[in-house]
Amino acid sequence: LFMKYQGIYFMKKTLIALAVAASAAISGSAMAWTPNGNGGSVQLSGMLTPDVKVTPWEVKVGDAVKGLDAKINKGQKTVDIAVTKTIPILGIRTQATKAFKGRDGITPQIDYHGAINISAFSDNATTLTLDVMDAETSKKIGKLEAIFSAGAIGSMHARTLAGHRAVHATRVGDGFFGGVSKEPKGVNSDAVKALLPELIPDVADNFDSQGVRMEKDAHTIKFSTIGNTYSAYYASGVRAGQNLEVMLDSPASGDTPIKWKASLPVTVTYM
């Protein structure tokens, strides 16, 4: 009987030892006492996986545009560059052709990082201002101004009402805030429907009017009301026939062409 219990004791002891060894292997290394030790460091690690927000939208950003050339005379600081072909900047539309259900966290917000003044919209347009840089040294050599056109159209269907209008955005949280006029007076509702596909040709392809005729007045829209269904699209760009006005900090000099570049950062978030 003694030998039986002694065997069970040693078996348990062996199992405990194996469990400790397995635990040490899983954690990467076992702690140890170090005679006359001087300390060390405790390493912490893991993995942070981005939480990809699923929305009903898809976004298109314009391609780089080259060949924006013009003649400039020595001593001249300002030159106009003709835009012979529309320059698309940003398009936002629904992924599906059927209206989606409203919910929190999916209303598009647009940030052009100070390049446009959304309070100065008139007839679906405002001024775009960018720093002009030396293409080789990336040093600022002037600024660029152009007429920036943009707009959005949305539809909404609720239990007791429906709407289909051009969009303005007064405050953060309104649909397309940062990319359209803050006030309804800056929106030309009669012209916006033709303007948007001129800026981004296929931007309206997935729009669902939900059987509602477009009204004359512009309105704000959010896409957060549960129980409502929505569809919308947005486009921005510089229209063909406009000019880019480049204003140099110093007059042109010498015979070497001035190679320039300008960048317009665009950020779309959802709230």
What residues fall within each predicted segment?
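N-terminal leader/presequence-like segments
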Residues: 1-32, 194-226
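Extreme N-terminal export signal peptides that direct proteins to the secretory pathway
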Residues: 1-165, 248-261, 271
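Generic alpha-helical secondary structure signal
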Residues: 116, 211, 234-238
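Short helix-loop boundary/capping segments
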Residues: 138-224
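Long, compositionally biased interface segments
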Residues: 220, 228-271
